[in-house]
Amino acid sequence: MHNLEVPEKAASLFGAAHYDGNLLILSCLHGVMGKVYADTVCSPQTAAAVIGDFTFFAGRVSHKAVAFRPKESKNDYRILIPQNRAWEEAIEAVYRGKYRKIERFATKKNPRAFDKDKLERIFSDFSRLSQRFEIVEITSQLYGQCLEMPWSRDLVSNYGSFAEFKKQGLGFVILDKGKIVSGASSYAACGDCI
């Protein structure tokens, strides 16, 4: 598999009908974050969009593509997303006995679906619960702390630096006496979306 210098060459393989404007794929295709690998650089027939733990397959099914592990893969596991049943079968064949099938649910992509009042009620309830905890935006120092702990690494690790995170992403953590105990952040960014 070849890293595409011009990721958009594989865009038609990912077709909107299959991935419905998935931000992770768009981020790869637009060259913002992640990478797109393909069977050939000139006229790809098989492609894989790789960002963080996720790999999205598209185009002509290839066992070689399924078995390919990009050098930037950080974990012992990957989340492989098939474009269709044929890709699913290829994943099952390549990783026979070594995979676990799960079903993930997408978040709502409609900005009007966000209930700001509900969030404010939750925040208000949180504030009354304890003076011990503090919700703060991720700073340069907290970015570094997130990278030090395995459970919090994914809060920031898809961004190459704090400057990149600050420019493209958004995130908050909950501190207990100065120690990060929870967090939420953007996994990826593309254009004005996170």
Task: Name these PLM-found stretches.
Residues 17-21, 32, 98:
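Short secondary-structure junctions and interdomain/linker hinges
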Residues 157-193:
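A conserved beta-strand-loop-helix scaffold within acyl/acetyltransferase catalytic domains
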Residues 12-16, 27-28, 68-71, 90-94, ...:
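Residues that form generic nucleotide/phosphate-binding pockets
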